[in-house]
């Protein structure tokens, strides 16, 4: 199944000059969604990890489904003020400002191996902040898995030295 056909291009969103890769048609189609999760799990089947860490919002959808299928724990990473317990955070740059990612301070035990999952690898800024959060808590990043990679933004350069798995590449 060609999963790329389920990704909708939205020009000039969230701002002029950006083509947004909308995964909601893929999520709506049960066969495509199942295929995407199965194939993303296959991409990391040879990696050793204890937890799946994923940011809101679309990262939750993919990360939680993968954690369930692989029999791993799931750790949510959220925007400020959304987690009820004490958190640590990292700031990162967006094309249009600065954002923060928060994780519970006890979410990852020292030495635990982590798979980071998100929907789209664009500039690598979010992934870089997630890596810093995992390391801040004493975890080790085993690999990163993404449904979509925007290779024309050259995100792998920013994440050099990490094992990056992607299903759909633009």
Swiss-Prot record:
Superkingdom in the source lineage: Bacteria
Q: Which pathway does this chain act in? A: Purine metabolism; AMP biosynthesis via salvage pathway; AMP from adenine: step 1/1
Positions in coiled-coil regions: none
Q: What InterPro entries does the entry give?
A: Ade_phspho_trans, PRibTrfase_dom, PRTase-like, UPRTase/APRTase
Keywords, comma-separated and alphabetical: Cytoplasm, Glycosyltransferase, Purine salvage, Transferase
Say yes or no: keyword Cytoplasm present.
yes
Pfam families per UniProt: Pribosyltran
Which SUPFAM superfamilies does the entry mention? PRTase-like
User: Record's Gene Ontology CC terms?
Assistant: cytoplasm
Where does the record say this protein resides? Answer: Cytoplasm
Q: How does it assemble?
A: Homodimer.
Query: What role does this protein play?
Result: Catalyzes a salvage reaction resulting in the formation of AMP, that is energically less costly than de novo synthesis.
Q: Which family does it belong to?
A: Belongs to the purine/pyrimidine phosphoribosyltransferase family.
Q: Which PANTHER family match?
A: ADENINE PHOSPHORIBOSYLTRANSFERASE (PTHR32315:SF3)
Q: In its UniProt entry, what is this protein called?
A: Adenine phosphoribosyltransferase
What is the species listed in this Swiss-Prot or TrEMBL entry?
Answer: Thermotoga neapolitana (strain ATCC 49049 / DSM 4359 / NBRC 107923 / NS-E)
């Amino acid at each position: 199944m060609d999963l790329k056909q389920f990704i909708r291009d939205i020009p000039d969103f969230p701002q002029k000059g950006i083509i947004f890769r909308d995964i909601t048609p893929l999520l709506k189609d049960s066969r495509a969604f199942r295929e995407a999760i199965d194939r993303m799990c296959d991409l990391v089947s040879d990696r050793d990890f204890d937890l799946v860490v994923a940011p809101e919002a679309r990262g939750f959808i993919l990360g939680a489904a993968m954690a369930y299928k692989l029999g791993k724990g799931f750790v949510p990473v959220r925007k400020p003020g959304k987690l009820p317990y004490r958190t640590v955070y990292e700031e990162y740059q967006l094309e249009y400002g600065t954002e923060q990612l928060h994780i519970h301070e006890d979410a990852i035990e020292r030495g635990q191996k982590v798979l980071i999952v998100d929907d789209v690898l664009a500039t690598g800024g979010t992934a870089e902040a997630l890596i810093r959060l995992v390391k801040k808590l004493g975890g080790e990043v085993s690999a990163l898995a993404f449904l979509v990679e925007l290779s024309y933004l050259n995100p792998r350069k920013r994440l050099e030295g990490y094992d990056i798995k992607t299903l759909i590449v633009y």
